[in-house]
Amino acid sequence: MQIHAGPASRRGRRGPLARLSGPEATCNSRPAARGRQRAAAPRMPAPERPRSRRPQSQPGPGELCVKPRKIVFADELRPREPLHPEKHPRDLGPRLNPVPDYELKYPPVTNRRDRSRYAAVFQDQYGEFSELQREVGATQAKLQQLEALLLSLPPPRSQKEARMAAHVRREFEKKRVDPGFLDKQARCNYLKGKLRHLKAQIRKFDDQQDSNSEDSVYF
C-alpha cells in the first residue's frame, strides 16, 4: 500500500534553510565567488640578476654614509717639515744671562785716549743715573709703606673698613705695575751696571799703569 504525501507533509519536510526568507536567504543563497572557486595559479619565480663582484674596500650603494666633518683649529696642526730644509748655522740656544751691550762696546782700556773717553761717558750719564735713582727710590718707599699698611690692617668689621682696605690695595697694585715706574726702574738698573763697568775698566787701567811705573828703573 503506497501512501502519497500531501502538500502539507511536503511543506513540513523542508529543512531550516528552505524556511529562511528575506535578506538572510538571499545572502546565504549567493554562489561562491568566482575567484575562490578557481585555485590561484602558481607564479614562476623571477630570475635573479647576476651580482657584480666589487672589491671589498668599495662600499655598496646602501652602505654609503656621510661622516661628520672634524673641526681642527690652526693651533692644533703640526707644522709641516720642508722637503728641502735650508742649512742654518748651529744654534747655541737662548742664553740665560745675555751679555749687556756696554760690556761689548767698552772693552778693557789700553791707552790714555780710551781712558779719557770712558771717563767722559761716565760723567755724562752719572747725572741721569742720580736723578732716576732718587725717583725710583721714592716710589719704592711709597710701595713699602702701602704694603706695610695692608699687612697691618685688621679684618674689616664694616663696609667702610672693607672699602678702605680695597682702596689701599688698588693703589698699591697701580703703583707697582705702573709702566712709567717700570721703565724708570729698568733704565736706572741699566745705567747702574754701565757706570760700574766703566769705573772698573778705568780702575784696571790705572792699576796697571801704577804697577808698570813701580817696576820701571830710571837712570
Swiss-Prot record:
The protein's matches in Gene3D superfamilies, at most eight in alphabetical order, are given as:
6.10.140.340
One Pfam annotation reads Occludin_ELL
Composition-biased stretches, type Low complexity, lie in: 17-43
Q: Where is the composition biased (Basic and acidic residues)?
A: 72-93
The record's annotation in PROSITE patterns points to: OCEL (PS51980)
Region described as Disordered: spans on this chain: 1-110
Instruction: Show the InterPro entries listed in the entry.
Output: ELL/occludin (IPR031176), Occludin_ELL (IPR010844)
Outline the extent of the OCEL domain: 100-210
Q: Which family does it belong to?
A: Belongs to the ELL/occludin family.
Q: By what name is this protein known? A: Occludin/ELL domain-containing protein 1
The top of its lineage is: Eukaryota, Metazoa, Chordata, Craniata, Vertebrata
